[in-house]
């Protein structure tokens, strides 16, 4: 997937699946809303949620975003998360972007305003996942791993480097 396509894909209200680690090392997955800022994924949660406690204990995580419409694609990213908490960090502007993306666009202002007002009553924090590994596949052109690498190389003008 090209960078512009990836940004457009991640701007849509697709639900992501976040993987965290349990204390014993087993993965724990949970559906999440996220906001991609071009460098990192922002995810909101509450201190009471299991996955939030896991990230506060061990910041390693993976986020998978898969969709079949309007564009069939997949984005996966792995990396450490950093917790951002009140009062040191104002979590509300990013939280408002999440509400706009997932509530306001599909359901309108009244639903979004009510949802956001409820969020502000909860003991919330934000996590910022800055990927150290990133995968993006556009299923419209995907014909297997090798063909995908060749397509990406043609699009970026580096075909000779990817023919290995």
Describe each model-derived feature in a short phrase.
Residues 58:
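Acidic-histidine catalytic/liganding microenvironments
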Residues 13-47, 53, 61-67, 74-76:
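Short beta-strand segments
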Residues 73-164:
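Charged, gly/pro-rich active-site loop segments
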Residues 66-68, 131-132:
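Short secondary-structure boundary segments
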Residues 1-17:
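Short, basic/aromatic recognition patches
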Residues 3-4, 48-49, 113:
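Structural motif corresponding to alpha-helix initiation and N-cap regions
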Residues 6-7, 52, 95, 116:
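Short amphipathic alpha-helical segments and helix-helix/interface helices
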Residues 9-12, 71, 123:
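A short, polar/charged loop/turn motif at coil->beta-strand junctions and beta-hairpin connectors
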């Amino acid at each position: 997937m090209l960078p512009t396509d990836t940004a457009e894909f991640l701007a849509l209200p697709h639900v992501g699946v976040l993987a965290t680690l349990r204390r014993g090392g087993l993965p724990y997955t949970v559906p999440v809303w996220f906001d991609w800022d071009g460098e990192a994924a922002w995810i909101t949660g509450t201190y009471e949620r299991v996955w939030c406690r896991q990230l506060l204990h061990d910041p390693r995580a993976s986020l998978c975003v898969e969709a079949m419409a309007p564009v069939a694609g997949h984005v996966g990213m792995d990396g450490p998360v950093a917790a951002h908490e009140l009062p040191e960090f104002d979590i509300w502007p990013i939280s408002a972007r999440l509400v706009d993306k997932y509530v306001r666009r599909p359901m309108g202002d009244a639903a979004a305003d009510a949802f956001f007002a409820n969020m502000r009553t909860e003991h919330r924090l934000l996590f910022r996942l800055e990927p150290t590994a990133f995968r993006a596949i556009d299923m419209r052109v995907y014909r297997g791993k090798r063909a995908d690498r060749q397509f990406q190389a043609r699009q970026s003008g580096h075909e000779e480097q990817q023919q290995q």
